[in-house]
Structure formats: structure tokens, C-alpha cells
Design a protein with these regions (language model features):
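Substrate-binding cleft of secreted/luminal carbohydrate-active enzymes
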Residues: 281-319, 331
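Hydrophobic h-region of N-terminal signal peptides that target proteins for export
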Residues: 10-19
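Boundary/entry segment of secreted carbohydrate-active catalytic domains
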Residues: 21-62
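Acidic-and-aromatic substrate-binding clefts and catalytic sites of carbohydrate-active enzymes
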Residues: 37-48, 67-80, 150-154, 202-211, ...
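Substrate-binding cleft and catalytic face of glycoside hydrolase catalytic domains
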Residues: 23-24, 54, 58-72, 81-202, ...
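Glycoside hydrolase catalytic-domain groove-lining segments
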Residues: 83-95, 169-198, 205-274, 292-297, ...
């Protein structure tokens, strides 16, 4: 009886939601991309797949295009899960953002050979970028070429990584030269793909975004093929400085690049059952509304993407030892939250085409 009731309830929820205005409908009318990060293994769950296809016009892999999955051994590439995601996107008329070609985390153990020379490391990175981008040429419209290259120290500096200086690719001490190499290699593999630099805690005007801004300005002046900047927008603050975020978006767009919000979630305090307070859910909705409005104010802010869409699979709980959660647009039962309605209404109210 209980199982039958649950199935009926889910069916009713799907029918009601499908008959209403969706995020995808509203984004299409405003000329925006609205996306989410995806785990391909969850596509086998009918309600996950149905909600994803109905609500979003863009998807991005959470993990399956990162090194540890796609290039697990020196001479071995595994495109199977990435291909599955791309096939889903094509069948549902969705765009795909590739994530990520160069990062300091989630790399396979074989990359951590400290006996390797910078020249050898450079050849490995170049081959990887050209192989992965080439495999998805014409199917992935945009790439996060380099992710989180700047650290959080004061003053901000390039993060010490296997790509920069341990052993690096022969560009240590030469500023953002290794990042430039990555963009040139990606462009050579797919000249039509949009190439983004992506970072965390750089959404407002601050020392990190200043460092990113200086790099992008230099790249644009010298013709380095960079097309955009991604602001991750992982927020734990229910009162972000929206004016500063809007100012930051504007100054990057003035350089001639796009800005995309790439990994948004808004973490809330939760109880032992994972439930947030209604008052916090309303504040969360305000944050989604205000950030989306700040993006939509600028014609060059072209996408709003969340890091997952259902609290059922959010990374926030495990990351915070389950003291935070409820960060996304749908709850664990795929019911839209106040944040969903707030984002949809902002998209519906915009006419930028």
C-alpha cells in the first residue's frame, strides 16, 4: 500500500510539474542557458532523468571528464561515461559543458611521479587536452580548460600543483604561462569550442578575482584564445554582496569575454534529518533570485548552472559532515523548493533576445 501510494504520488508530481512552466521554458524565452552538473550513473533513475530533461537546456559532468576517470592510465582513455552523458544531451536537445581539462585534484596516481621532467609532464598534458577535446569536438560546446589555478592566500598567487611547479610543465615562475599553453592546446583541438577559466570564491570583487581579471586582460590583449570566465558560486552566506558580484561580472564582460555561473549551490544549516528551516529556505530563494538577476542584468552573462539539482545527490552533506545541506533547487524527493520558483520567475521576467 505504501509503495503504491509513493509511486502514484511521484507520478502526480511529475505530471503536475511537467504541465507547469519549467526552468528550461523560461530560460529559452530569456535567451539564457540554465544548466546543472550531472552524474551519468543517475540517468538510470527515471525521475532523475525526467527532471533533468524537462528543466535544463545544458548539462555538465560532475566527475566523469576529470583525469582520474577519463585518463586512468598513461595509455588508456575511458570515454564511456562522458559519451553516455553526451548522448543523453543530444537526445534531449541540450548543450554540454566539458569539465575540466586541468585541475589539481582528482588526478590518477600515475600522474604523481615526481621523477618526471617538466618536459615530459608538458607532453602528457598537451596530449591529454588535445585527445579529450578532440574526442568531443562538435559535441561539447564549451570547456573549463583550467580550474582553480589561483590559491586563497594573501597575496593571491598561482596554486602549487603538478601542472605549475611540482614538477610543472616548464612554466614555473612564469606567471600564467602554463594556463596559456592549456588554452592554446584546447583551441587547436577544437577551434569552435568556447574556452573558459573557472574558479571558486572569485564571484565578487576581491583579491582572487583581481588576479583572475589581470590574467584574462593580459590574455585578451595578446590574443590568447580565452572566451569566458566561470564563477562557481558555491555559497554558504545567505547575504552575499550582490552589488560586488554584479560589478565583477560587468568588468569581465567589458574585456570581451562571457561570464557563466557554473557551480551554484547555497548551503543551509540542517537538522539531523537533513531538513532546513522554512525561514532559511526563503532566504535561500532570495539568494538565487538576486544572483540570477545580477547575471541577467549583463548581456554577456550567458548561463546559470547549479552543481546538481536535487538535494538527494548534493555534495554539501558529506563535505560538511551533514551539518549543512538543502543547497539545490529540488529536495531529495524531486519536489521544487522556493529557490526553484525564484529562479524560474527571474528567468521568465527577462527578455534579452
Amino acid at each position: 500500500m505504501t509503495r503504491s501510494f509513493s509511486c502514484v504520488a511521484l507520478l502526480i508530481l511529475a505530471v503536475v510539474t511537467a504541465s507547469s512552466q519549467t526552468l528550461r521554458d523560461s530560460a529559452g524565452r530569456s535567451g539564457m542557458l540554465v544548466g546543472t552538473a550531472v552524474r551519468p550513473q543517475q540517468l538510470s533513475e527515471p525521475l532523475y532523468a525526467a527532471t533533468l530533461a524537462r528543466e535544463f537546456n545544458m548539462i555538465e559532468p560532475e566527475d566523469v571528464m576529470k583525469w582520474e576517470t577519463i585518463h586512468p592510465a598513461p595509455e588508456s582513455y575511458d570515454f564511456s561515461q562522458g559519451d553516455r552523458l553526451v548522448a543523453f544531451a543530444i537526445s534531449h536537445r541540450m548543450k554540454v559543458r566539458g569539465h575540466t581539462l586541468t585541475w589539481h585534484q582528482q588526478n590518477p596516481p600515475w600522474l604523481n611521479d615526481r621523477q618526471r621532467t617538466p618536459e615530459q609532464q608538458a607532453r602528457i598534458l598537451e596530449q591529454h587536452i588535445k585527445t579529450v577535446v578532440g574526442h568531443y569536438r562538435g559535441k561539447v560546446f564549451a570547456w573549463d580548460v583550467v580550474n582553480e589555478a589561483f590559491d586563497e592566500t594573501t597575496p593571491v598567487k598561482l596554486r602549487s600543483t603538478i601542472w605549475y611547479d611540482q614538477p610543472g610543465i616548464g612554466r614555473a615562475g612564469k606567471g600564467s604561462a602554463y594556463i596559456e599553453d592549456c588554452f592554446r592546446w584546447a583551441h587547436a583541438a577544437d577551434p569552435d569550442a568556447l574556452l573558459f577559466y573557472n574558479d571558486v570564491e572569485a564571484e565578487a570583487v576581491n583579491p582572487k578575482s583581481d588576479a583572475v581579471y589581470a590574467m584574462v586582460r593580459d590574455f585578451r590583449r595578446r590574443g590568447v584564445p580565452i572566451d569566458g570566465v566561470g564563477f562557481q558560486m558555491h555559497l554558504g552566506n545567505l547575504h552575499p554582496d550582490v552589488a560586488s558580484i554584479s560589478e565583477n561580472i560587468g568588468r569581465f564582460i567589458a574585456l570581451g569575454v562571457q561570464v557563466q555561473i557554473t557551480e551554484m549551490d547555497v548551503a543551509l544549516p540542517v537538522d539531523s534529518s537533513g531538513n532546513a528551516r522554512p525561514a532559511d529556505l526563503r532566504l535561500q530563494a532570495d539568494v538565487y533570485r538576486e544572483i540570477a538577476s545580477a547575471c541577467l542584468t549583463h548581456a554577456g552573462c550567458t548561463a546559470i548552472q547549479t552543481w546538481g539539482f536535487t538535494d538527494k545527490y548534493s555534495w554539501i552533506g558529506s563535505h560538511s559532515k551533514h551539518t549543512q545541506g538543502s543547497a539545490l533547487l529540488f529536495d531529495g524527493e524531486y519536489r521544487p523548493k522556493p529557490a526553484y520558483d525564484a529562479l524560474r520567475k527571474v528567468l521568465e521576467g527577462s527578455r534579452r533576445q
